[in-house]
Structures are given as C-alpha cells and as structure tokens.
Amino acid sequence: MRLVHAVLLPGIIVFVSNGNLLHAHALHEDETGVTAGRQLRAAASEVFGLSRASFGLGKAQDPLDKFFRKIINSRKPIETSYSAKGIHEKIIKAYDRHVFESKKAHDRHVSKSKKAHGRHVSKSKMAHDRHVSKSEKAPIQYASVADYLKKIYPGTDIERIVSTLKRHDEVGAKDLGAKLQTAVASQ
C-alpha cells in the first residue's frame, strides 16, 4: 500500500493512502489544549460517515481535498459536534493567513526583483554613457597626442614611432599606433 504524505492546509498534516484517511495531525494546539488535529479527525469522521474507531481504516466517500475545499469555500462551518469549538473557523483563518503570507512574500520578491532590475538597467546605462563619452572624446585626445609628438619629434620621426607601435606584439600598442596614424594623417 503506497502512503502519500501531504500538507493540505497550513498547520495540518494529513496521511492518505489509496483514498483512505489514515491520520490527520495538527502542528499547533488550540487554547483549550485539545489539538486541532483531533477536532479535524472527528469532523472528517462525521463528514465522511466514519466512526472514530474505524477512522484509521475507513474509506473516504469524497477525496480529501474536496472535504477541505468544502470547508474553505463555504466560509461557514460544516455541521458537526465539533463546530462549536471553532475547528472550521480555525482552518479557514489558517488558510487565509497562509494565502495572505504567500501573497506578501510574492509581493516582496517582485518588489526586490524590480528594484534589482532597475539598478541593473541604471548601471548598464551609466556604463554605456561612459563608454560613448570616451569614444566621442577619443579622436580629440589622439589628435592632441599626435600634435604633441609632432612638436617633440620633427619630420619622419613621428611616422617611425607610429609604425613601430602598429607592429608591436601587444594589441593595445597596435591599436594606439593605428589611432595615432589616423590622427597624424588627418592633420
């Protein structure tokens, strides 16, 4: 016989096997000292027409989730001798609290995600703007470097320096040589 363990409602653990309700257990005790689980078992017993003695082996007439859905959707107690003790109200409140907490957690997650996305977009835009700004300034900078080199190295010396840079093994030096050559040629 395959045993299925499920948490069907916050705070209530239910063990089911092939449609048989084997055990319902509450994680918290209520203020009277009687566990909500005992009240739940008794309520399920009455709804499913099971006596307390045969409760462990009795066959449920409806799937368990229908029983819980009946309690939650009706928003009013199913008539049992335990209704007065408020088990149904507690189940509904626990379910509502669970839904509310889940929604709050979801909203916090969405809010954090939106903030993180906004920061990412902002940083990306700033990096892009810096990059664009550097490339716009670059021709002016290389032109001023070329001017300076022309003043220091007269005649063909500047062309020799640029040519040496272009043949250099390092990519940065080659790139600098090419940009300086463009700047020198445009002057």
Curated annotation (Swiss-Prot):
The keyword Transport does not apply. Residues 126-136 have a biased composition (Basic and acidic residues). A motif (RxLR) lies at residues 38-41. It is found in: Secreted; Host nucleus, Host nucleolus; Host cytoplasm. Keywords: Host cytoplasm, Host nucleus, Repeat, Secreted, Signal, Virulence. This is Virulence protein ATR13. Residues 93-136 are annotated as: 4 X 11 AA tandem repeats. Residues 137-187 are annotated as: Highly variable C-terminus domain. Its main location: secreted. Sequence repeats lie at residues 93-103, 104-114, 115-125, 126-136. Gene3D superfamilies: Avirulence protein ATR13 (1.25.40.640). GO terms for cellular component: extracellular region; host cell cytoplasm; host cell nucleolus. The keyword Signal applies. The gene is ATR13. Residues 104-136 are annotated as: Disordered. The ATR13 effector protein is a highly polymorphic member of the RXLR class, yet only a small subset of the polymorphic residues appear to be involved in RPP13Nd-mediated recognition. Polymorphic residues of ATR13 appear as clusters across the surface of the protein. ATR13-Emoy2 is not recognized by RPP13-Nd because it has Ile-152 and Gln-181 rather than 'Thr-152' and 'Arg-181' within the highly variable C-terminus domain. Secreted effector that acts as an elicitor of hypersensitive response (HR) specifically on plants carrying defense protein RPP13. Recognition of ATR13 by RPP13 initiates defense responses that are effective against oomycete, bacterial and viral pathogens. Due to high polymorphism, ATR13-Emoy2 does not recognize RPP13-Nd, the RPP13 defense protein from Arabidopsis thaliana ecotype Niederzenz. ATR13-Emoy2 is recognized by RPP13 variants RPP13-UKID44, RPP13-UKID65 and RPP13-UKID71. Pfam families: ATR13. Residues 50-92 are annotated as: Leucine heptad repeat region. Residues 111-125 have a biased composition (Basic residues). Residues 1-19 form the signal peptide. The lineage of its organism: Eukaryota, Sar, Stramenopiles, Oomycota, Peronosporales. Has the canonical translocation motif RxLR, but lacks the canonical EER motif, which characterizes most oomycete effectors identified so far. Belongs to the RxLR effector family.
